[in-house]
UniProtKB/Swiss-Prot annotation:
Its EC number is 2.4.1.18. The lineage of its organism: Bacteria, Pseudomonadati, Pseudomonadota, Alphaproteobacteria, Hyphomicrobiales. This is 1,4-alpha-glucan branching enzyme GlgB. HAMAP family: GlgB. It comes from the Bacteria. It comes from Bradyrhizobium diazoefficiens (strain JCM 10833 / BCRC 13528 / IAM 13628 / NBRC 14792 / USDA 110). It holds the Pfam family CBM_48.
Length: 721
């Protein structure tokens, strides 16, 4: 019996390929001119026979030189293009060799990536359909500078990490073009860490689509050809424009009869029209980036570039944005650049080291949330985040971003006990690198999208959050006014008889109301974790609770600052928000609840129609106190002013259950003043006490109105031109 031909001795590079530790498989695999021939090497572990088919039909048999599946042969000298023909079991397959194609990243790309200034990472990193040398396929690029080996695994290679090891380029970016991989293919990255340890399969940080949880594979999607939604109306984010935001969790606004989510397209048929009818100028979505845990509400994302697949495809999400803009409603996204979860398929220990996060848990882990904190000192990380912000505005025509948990980013000792944090280089608690990141984020976003806006959820007294970077600020368009929210909710929760002792909680907010461009937020955070619903905080019997709520909402809309209401506030949701259930829309069958909805609709319309109520929301010159000292009667009065000297609106709020008649308020103009809204109207469920639509200012040295002030109510009056 003839003896088997012995395997030839192989170079060290061959064993590096076989053992999955070669950082540049192109250096060995593929076609290489050697000794007057075109040597072809292929690593196909499951193949029994392999041939190379040249561009002119010439065929070269590749010898199996190692039992692991390494094949070597030669085509005639001068051959450049070829295919591989391999036998797998009983099947013979002819296919392109991934290791014969040119690089994906250019030298200029690598320069910008290394510098951390590439503003369009989404054009280069991730998975992109492309054509190289006339062959269609997918180009994959991922950052893993400390990895020993990175492979792409997916539907196109039976999830075999031996089939498609990538090559590393400058600054630790790994790339590979896989011929005939296609849109819709599922994939992940198989990574061996710097010490040779195998990591869990990683989702693509730049994936544009993902599987529905609990599955975690990334999905190839051609985002460059995504139909871009139409733009929002011009000037929708201007400081002088009305801004009334309806904050929505897409998974629980409405649900189907079987408690299933509405899809993006089903939401597009209902939500934008509802927001427009209710008078809101903007919708703000809780984070839509892919996230593994429903209970995080999206605030622990693993896929920052992928709209969550819970509700449909990226095209479906684009259709929702387009529907909003068609209705004249702007779209804001909650954006989470402060932290991320430590799920094994995510960003944590991505290449076997702390690539995206800090290695030291005193810097890299949130004690409150058990999440990981981005390392803003790495240019690759800040580039990843800034590009993500720009991505949402460019690809999906988003009108602005609200940045979550800014305070946790600004302070190194945020929610940490003494000794559990590391000071900055000056010994302070300020996170200098995070400050630089936020300034860069705002600077680059407004440079690219000057009509957009940003808002910061910042709960401390950090100065100049919404002031320009060039003047020492963080550069945000707006800041959430958390102090106003806490003080006023505390005030309104008191029994009216005790409110005179808390009078200053209403007044205090006006001492700083114009230090920032403020949004007044009644957000999702205020209706969870035992805080009760907004209605649930109101004291008194049923009538008083709803009257208090009507007065409070009216006070909010008359107060300087842009407005934000979380879904359910407009129907006086009785219970706390539950992300696993729809809002209680059946409550609208009851007059008090439908009355609140009618009031919010009319407050929005009034806010938009009366320039004095919005044009100078963020300007001290747009506000004047008229009555601040009537604590015994719980009455406040002020004047709102527009840009035109005759644009005025008088707001009077009575936080007591008493009716006050012949109540005197000085005004700037004599003549007729129209009562344009009364929250005590029977239309809203009130007692219908008021001024029969108008009142005349008594002329004198100072014009004066003598008014009937309804109980637990607010009235708005404007001078008749």
């Amino acid at each position: 019996m003839p003896r088997a031909k012995p395997m030839p001795k192989l170079p060290a590079e061959a064993y590096a390929i076989i053992e999955g530790r070669h950082a540049d498989p192109f250096h060995y695999l593929g076609l290489h001119p050697e000794g007057g021939k075109s040597v072809v090497r292929a690593f196909l572990p499951e193949a029994s026979n392999v041939e190379a088919v040249g561009e002119h039909g010439e065929v070269a048999r590749l010898d199996r030189v190692h039992d692991a599946g390494l094949f070597v042969g030669a085509l005639p000298n001068g051959s450049k293009h070829y295919q591989l023909r391999a036998k797998f079991g009983d099947s013979i397959v002819e296919f392109e060799d991934a290791y014969r194609f040119p690089p994906i990243l250019t030298d200029f790309d690598l320069y910008l990536l290394g510098e951390g200034t590439h503003q369009r990472l989404y054009d280069k990193l991730g998975a992109h359909p492309m054509t190289l040398d006339g062959v269609d396929g997918i180009g994959f690029v991922v950052l893993a500078p400390n990895a020993r080996r990175v492979s792409v695994v997916g539907d196109f290679n039976f999830w075999d990490s031996r089939r498609h090891p990538m090559r590393v380029r400058g600054s630790g970016y790994w790339e590979l073009f896989i011929p005939h991989a296609k849109r819709g293919d599922h994939y992940k990255f198989d990574i061996v860490g710097p010490h040779g340890h195998q990591l869990p399969l990683k989702s693509d940080p730049m994936a544009f689509a993902s599987e529905v949880r609990p599955k975690t594979a990334s999905i190839v999607f051609d985002e460059a050809h995504l139909p871009r939604p139409r733009p929002a109306p011009d000037g929708i984010n201007a400081l002088s424009a009305p801004m009334s935001i309806y904050e929505v969790h897409l998974g629980s606004w409405r649900r189907k009869g079987d408690n299933e989510w509405l899809t993006y397209r089903e939401l597009a048929e209902q939500l934008p029209a509802y927001a427009r009818d209710m008078g809101f100028t903007h919708l703000e979505f809780l984070p839509v980036s892919e996230h593994p845990f429903d209970g995080s509400w999206g605030y622990q994302p693993t896929g920052l570039y992928a709209p969550t697949s819970r509700f449909g495809t990226p095209e479906d999400f684009a259709a929702l944005v387009d529907a909003c803009h068609r209705e004249g409603v702007g779209v804001l996204l909650d954006w989470v650049p402060g932290h991320f979860p430590d799920d094994p398929h995510g960003l944590g220990s991505f290449d076997g080291t702390s690539l995206y996060e800090h290695a030291n848990p005193l810097q890299g882990r949130h004690l409150d949330w058990g999440t990981l904190i981005y390392n803003y000192g790495r240019t690759e990380v800040t580039n990843f985040l800034v590009s993500n912000a720009l991505f949402w505005l460019e690809r999906y025509a988003i009108d602005g971003l609200r940045v979550d948990a800014v305070a946790s980013m600004l302070y190194l000792d945020y929610s940490r006990p003494p000794g559990a944090w590391i000071p900055n280089q000056y010994g302070g608690r300020e996170n200098i690198e995070a400050i630089a990141f936020l300034r860069r984020f705002n600077t680059e976003l407004f440079a690219r999208f000057p009509q957009a806006t940003t808002a910061a959820e910042e709960s401390t007294a950090w100065p100049q959050v919404s002031r320009p970077v060039e003047f020492g600020g963080l550069g945000f368009g707006y800041k959430w006014n958390m102090g106003w929210m806490h003080d006023t909710l505390n005030y309104i929760s008191k029994d009216p008889i005790h409110r005179k002792h808390h009078h200053g909680e209403i007044l205090f907010g006006l001492h700083y109301a114009f230090s920032e461009n403020f949004i007044l937020p009644l957000s999702h955070d205020e209706v969870v974790h035992g805080k009760r619903s907004i209605l649930g905080r109101m004291p008194g019997d049923e009538w008083q609770r709803f009257a208090n709520l009507r007065a409070y909402y009216s006070f909010m809309f008359g107060h300087p600052g842009k407005k934000l209401l979380f879904m359910g506030a407009e129907i006086a949701q009785s219970r706390e928000w539950n992300h696993d259930q729809s809002l209680d829309w059946h409550l609208l069958e009851y007059k008090y609840h439908s009355g609140i909805q009618a009031l919010i609709r009319d407050l929005n319309r009034l806010y938009r129609a009366v320039p004095a109520l919005h044009q100078m929301d963020c300007d001290q010159a747009g506000f004047e106190w008229l009555i601040t000292d009537d604590a015994n009667r719980n009455v406040f009065a002020w004047l709102r002013k527009g840009l035109d000297e005759h644009a005025r609106c008088l707001v009077i709020v009575n936080f007591s259950p008493n009716v006050y008649r012949n109540y005197r308020v000085r005004v700037p103009f004599a003549g007729k003043w129209k009562e344009v809204l009364n929250s005590d109207s029977a239309h809203y469920g009130g007692s219908n006490v008021g001024n029969i639509g108008e009142v005349h200012a008594v002329d004198g040295k100072t014009p004066e109105l003598r008014l009937t002030i309804p109980p637990l109510a607010a009235i708005f009056l404007v001078p008749e031109s």
